């Protein structure tokens, strides 16, 4: 999964590729769309230091293909229409489009652990933040957009049985807290705290300078990012048809979330 900022940035840009009526809907339910752009990742934060049934839902939903997830979600929305739910789903589509396009390169590059999977994603976030003039990149709060009302949590939980609104609220809340913590100025203390969560958590701590271990992979990743953005409009159109009348999704949805 490209990290916090890459997904949020992608969703902001992808919204411009939607038809006007969907752009208006996304703007009305911006919180749901923004949270949707992080996909099922919030489950990983439900109880990050311990293995739990709810936390494992993150792995379960990442193993699903796009067809399995989006056709099932579309069926639920046809049975119980929800404009907020629709906005959330187009946000999740952003997450899926970016992950499914970038993950093959990330997995291949990190297969030998140099750089690590999360390390590369974090460095890609640092690159995009710097490119967008959000400097210093390591002091930006990537979790500031992660907010949901209780009603929003109820809406989101409907896409992830057997999750509940409480599951969603806790996962999103701790994810936002982690994002806020990652922007703290005391980097030594931050590194010490996140090392408690293991290698994956430690690699979430952004370097203050470019990470040379990732240098050769940033440009290819950015090209894949642009490719995913180009694909989004056609994928969104397919999702729209699926929502309207159950039209099956195409081969672009055959791969898993990763």
Q: What do the PLM-derived regions correspond to, one by one?
A:
Residues 1-89, 93, 97-258:
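N-terminal leader/auxiliary helical segments
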